UniProtKB/Swiss-Prot annotation:
Ferritin-like diiron domain residues: 1-148
GO MF annotations in UniProt: ferric iron binding
Any Pfam family the entry gives: Ferritin
Keyword presence, Iron: yes
Protein name: Uncharacterized protein UU427
Keywords annotated in UniProt: Iron
Organism superkingdom: Bacteria
Entry-linked InterPro entries: Ferritin-like (IPR012347), Ferritin-like_diiron (IPR009040), Ferritin-like_SF (IPR009078), Ferritin_DPS_dom (IPR008331)
Amino acid sequence: MVKSQKVIDVLNTHYNLNLELGSIYAQYAHIADDQFSMPFLAKFIADLSNDKLGVHKNLISEYARKVEIPLHTKFSVDVNFKPANPKELIKHILDTELKVRKHVANMAKVCLEENDFETFSFVKWFVDDGIKDFDDVRTIHDFFENATNNLQVEYAIRKYLKQMKVEEEK
C-alpha cells in the first residue's frame, strides 16, 4: 500500500522524537548519577534511553524499509534543563512521556484518517509501549512522592528494576 504524505510525516516525526529523547535521556541518566548520586535512578533513565534509541528506532526503521518509505533524520539535542533535585528530574521525564503519549495518539489518529490500517496496526505497538513507559516513570515519580529521602527512593527503584527484569524474562 502506498503511504500518504501525512503518514510518512508522522512516522518521520516519531522516528526523530525517539532519537532526540533517547539522546536527552542518556544525558539525564548522567545527571542522576553524577549530580544526584543515584545510580539506580540513572539506570532506570538509561534503560528508557536505550529503549528509544534501540527498540523504538529499530522498529520504525524496519517498518520503513518494509513499506518503502523514506526516513529523514532531523533532530538536534540541547539539554538545557537543569533540575535542582532528582524529584524535579523525574517529574520532567513524566511530563515528557505524557507529551509522547499525546504524540502517539495523534500518530494513530492520522493513520485512521488516512485509512492506513496497516500502519495503524504497526502504531498500536507504540501505544501499548507508551502506556508501559508512562506507568513505569509514574511509579518512579510516586516513589519520590512517598519517600522521606533519596536513599529510600534508590532502594525502591532497585527493587523495581529487579521486578521489571523478572517480568521481562517471563
